[in-house]
Amino acid sequence: MTETAKHADYILPTTTQYEKAEATFFNFEFPDNYFHLRHPVVNPADDSDVLDEGEIHARLVEQLNELPDEVGYINRELKERGLENFSQIFDEAASKNPKINLYAPVILYRTLGQLLPNGLANAAALWKIANKVATRSPESLRRAGLNGESKNRGGRVIL
């Protein structure tokens, strides 16, 4: 237990940085910044009772009854219309309920996160910013090998 944890009233059982997807930002030369998403290096021990932050946050929002009903709509539509339509599905839900954007990281974790490879569900929270980058810097994505005009090209960055 860390020194900080010894003083805490509550300790949440979270995975370590090696047991989950971890992000790093690099500032090589102003104004260029680089971002790297690392896959988990090891799995949590079989006898550990840990959760990643996305799961902890989602459970807290659910216990507070704050998760919008549109999450079910997003999951149904995603299953029916496919991942390539995720941007449109998410935007449709957000236009019906402003809480979608308020709780976007949790909703992305509970929807898109379930479709990501094992250990990357937390990366779903990056979807909105990845789409923003794809819109603002399409040439950078092309140089990275992500070609095409898909509306969800930014989402492919995290897949």
Could you describe each region identified by the protein language model?
Residues 88-159:
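Long, low-complexity segments enriched in small/aliphatic residues
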Residues 1-94:
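Non-catalytic alpha/beta scaffold blocks inside enzyme catalytic domains
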